[in-house]
Amino acid sequence: MLPRLLLLICAPLCEPAELFLIASPSHPTEGSPVTLTCKMPFLQSSDAQFQFCFFRDTRALGPGWSSSPKLQIAAMWKEDTGSYWCEAQTMASKVLRSRRSQINVHRVPVADVSLETQPPGGQVMEGDRLVLICSVAMGTGDITFLWYKGAVGLNLQSKTQRSLTAEYEIPSVRESDAEQYYCVAENGYGPSPSGLVSITVRIPVSRPILMLRAPRAQAAVEDVLELHCEALRGSPPILYWFYHEDITLGSRSAPSGGGASFNLSLTEEHSGNYSCEANNGLGAQRSEAVTLNFTVPTGARSNHLTSGVIEGLLSTLGPATVALLFCYGLKRKIGRRSARDPLRSLPSPLPQEFTYLNSPTPGQLQPIYENVNVVSGDEVYSLAYYNQPEQESVAAETLGTHMEDKVSLDIYSRLRKANITDVDYEDAM
């Protein structure tokens, strides 16, 4: 009877103690550490020697069996979500198992996506290396990064990694790489894009080409020569310098790229070699020399000298010289008129038009008029005269004498005011 009583008393004390698994924190986020503890409430560790092992689902974690009742997990990830439990083994190979505990790992969505460039500022020389760095301020787990070119969105590359930043590299930048870029990051909660970043590719100027343009095939003194310099490649703005031999003629700017022109009025000293230089701050390039040769005719020099002397004399003598020259010309004109027509005598020979006295109406003789040049102002005078036959009767002579007395004093008669169609008499003669 006594052995049975002792068995009933000792039975509860001899049963294996219950195990509990404790996770700290119990609801971890991705990337955070977690500590697992295998615990027996009524059993002190000094009372017995145990070996512990931790499991997730059916897989053992850590180093396997260990004397430590704790397991430290450095970082938990979304895929670490599952059912966890632990086991304890006594020296007598008795194994105790805890209940299962569900641990859910929470993922943080990506946020605040940004795109940066290296070199900074988005300006890069042609042929240099360009790096596009996509970053997120927050987000956990595996993040997929994608890079796009242009507002339309040409996909360049994608990377998936457990990191807050990722890089896309262009080893050697070309002119066609000048565009707008952006990146997208996502970790299972939808894509989150960055802002647009403009990339400017700076291109050094190529060797410029110089062209000389003259108004004629053979350039001459006083012609305006156009010097046109153009670099076919190069980022604007471009500054052009123009040279005659090694003498600087001037400069012109092309703010939007392309070429520029410089005009030069040619003199005798402008024969020789011309060149130009292009510079956009990334290095200067000089054109090949262009030779311009032209000759100055001797006659042109003497004519140029004579006209210069005359112009100098006129400018020195001034209005007095002009007045004297005018008076001299007027005097010559008056003398020429006097020699040709002294005292405005009748024209000789007389016009061969006749009116005979034996006509049926002898009293209706018509005078013959000819215009005389202007005497003064705008008045025009005419010359009137008669012709008489050499052989006439006595009666006719008497009549002719009477008629001559009547008109002899009336040789000049004023006819009318001058108009624009009157012709100078002496000019008509």
From Swiss-Prot:
Location of the motif ITIM motif 2: 367-372
Disulfide bonds: C38-C86, C134-C183, C229-C276
Extracellular topological segments: 17-307
Every Ig-like C2-type domain range: 17-104, 109-200, 208-291
Membrane spanning stretches: 308-328
Gene Ontology cellular component annotations, sorted alphabetically: cell surface; external side of plasma membrane
Gene3D superfamilies referenced in this protein's UniProt entry, alphabetically: Immunoglobulins
Pfam families on file: Ig_3 (PF13927)
Compartmental location: Cell membrane
CDD domains per UniProt: Ig
Cytoplasmic compartment segments: 329-429
Motif ITIM motif 5, residue numbers: 423-428
Membrane disposition: Single-pass type I membrane protein
Tissue expression summary: Primarily expressed in secondary lymphoid tissues by mature subsets of B-cells. Detected in spleen, lymph node, heart, skeletal muscle, kidney, liver and placenta. Specifically expressed by mature B lineage cells with higher expression in naive versus memory B-cells (at protein level).
Function according to Swiss-Prot or TrEMBL: Type I transmembrane surface glycoprotein preferentially expressed by B-cells that regulates BCR-mediated signaling responses. Recruits ABL1 as the intracellular effector molecule to enhance B-cell activation. Also plays a negative role by suppressing ERK activation under homeostatic and BCR-stimulated conditions in a GRB2-dependent manner.
Assembly and binders: Interacts with ABL1. Interacts with GRB2 and SOS1. Interacts with SHIP-1/INPP5D.
Protein name: Fc receptor-like protein 1
Organism from which the protein derives: Homo sapiens
Lineage, top ranks: Eukaryota, Metazoa, Chordata, Craniata, Vertebrata
